[in-house]
Amino acid sequence: MRAIMVGPPGSGKGTQCGLIQSRLGISVIATGDVFRERMKTDMALRDIVSSGGYVSDSTTNRIVEDCLDKEDVSSGFVLDGYPRTLQQLDFLEGFLKRRALTLDAVFSLEVATDLLIERLRARSKESGRTDDRDSVIARRLEIYTEMTLPIIDACEEKGLLHRIDASKGIEEVFQSIKDVFDRVTI
């Protein structure tokens, strides 16, 4: 299965992808983790992410392509946090097509804004992540709405979208995702 996990910051993408990887054995490429690792040596990237800015499509595509080239994408993967724009989606579909592969599913984790803010504030206190400060949270949610919602619409038109109520408990959300995996991979 080749899938995408989308959702606003705080929707549980990382948590669910961790469960998918550990319980279903599917490789997960988490762009947020990749970016945080690269930020240790790339000051320009660190400045953009720390201020809540949006990393350009060309930079993001290059980073994801590097990751996908290192993974065996033919056996399946889940992308966490990518693509976030229509240009990135087009790039991904072209990348897969050049390898005679297709996208199988897109999971949209959906959560009310007030619950997202509550989750992100709690995460900031626990982890000290600089991208979870209130001012940055508001900007990240704004960027998500502007940039990523067209991805959801495009994937829905292609029949790939599976909306998941991510306001539920972790196990309930995982079961909803697993049910889709079971249906799609039959």
From Swiss-Prot:
- Key words, A-Z: ATP-binding, Cytoplasm, Kinase, Nucleotide biosynthesis, Nucleotide-binding, Transferase
Q: Per the record, what are the reactions this protein catalyses?
A: AMP + ATP = 2 ADP
UniProt cross-references to Gene3D superfamilies, sorted A to Z: P-loop containing nucleotide triphosphate hydrolases
What are the start and end residues of every segment in region (NMP)? 30-55
EC number in record:
2.7.4.3
Pathway annotation: Purine metabolism; AMP biosynthesis via salvage pathway; AMP from ADP: step 1/1
Q: Which residues bind ATP?
A: G10, S11, G12, K13, G14, T15, R123, K168
Binding positions (AMP): T31, R36, G53, Y54, V55, G81, Y82, P83, R84, Q88, R129, R140
Q: Which Pfam families match?
A: ADK (PF00406)
Q: Does the entry feature the keyword Cytoplasm, yes or no?
A: yes
Instruction: Name the enzyme group at the top EC level.
Output: transferase
Q: Which GO terms describe its molecular function?
A: adenylate kinase activity; ATP binding
Instruction: State its location(s).
Output: Cytoplasm
Q: Which segments carry the region annotation LID?
A: 122-132
State the PROSITE patterns in the record: ADENYLATE_KINASE
- An example Gene Ontology biological process: AMP salvage
Q: Does the keyword Cell cycle apply?
A: no
The UniProt comment on domains reads: Consists of three domains, a large central CORE domain and two small peripheral domains, NMPbind and LID, which undergo movements during catalysis. The LID domain closes over the site of phosphoryl transfer upon ATP binding. Assembling and dissambling the active center during each catalytic cycle provides an effective means to prevent ATP hydrolysis.
Subunit structure, briefly? Monomer.
As for family, the record states: Belongs to the adenylate kinase family.
The record's function comment reads: Catalyzes the reversible transfer of the terminal phosphate group between ATP and AMP. Plays an important role in cellular energy homeostasis and in adenine nucleotide metabolism.
Please give the name of this protein: Adenylate kinase
Organism classification: Bacteria, Bacillati, Actinomycetota, Actinomycetes, Micrococcales
